[in-house]
Amino acid sequence: YLREGIQITTRIKDKEDFDIVRLIDFDHPEQNTFTVVNQMWIKGHYNYRRPDVLLFINGLPVVFIELKKATVKVEEAYHKNLLSYRKDIPNIFAFNQICVLSNGLETRLGAWSASYDYFFEWLKVDSEKEKINRKAIAEHDTSVINLIDGLLRKDRLLDYIENFVFFDRGNKI
């Protein structure tokens, strides 16, 4: 739905017609509304939950971000937070394209349904040719900043969603 849109059928008198409603305007990024929400309360199956950060495009939660202190391993964000959110508030992942887990020193991204082994670091901001300085990233706690600047800029995020997210429909490749 995010890439191709939704077909809406209308019937006027005896004539049936349809239109495609685009949920995201990939051709004109400025036509979309981007909203970042910090610690929004969401009613879950058993109680209220509060993800650290959600990024919405046109009201759809497309990016989930779980943040930890630098002393907490990123893997804990996956096992203690993301897995429980998936069970208790699964609706926030209906349109999710990216899950980010970070402690400032290490930042990983993956699909909401992926195992932790499929969450990977995002280290570059502008170019694949950039040299990675892991020491500087660790000293300045910039791994999450690199991801924000490198992936979550409006134009880049839309490009990533439109062109680099694989939608598994259960068919073999």
Predicted regions and their residues:
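ATP-dependent helicase/translocase motor core
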Residues: 1-173
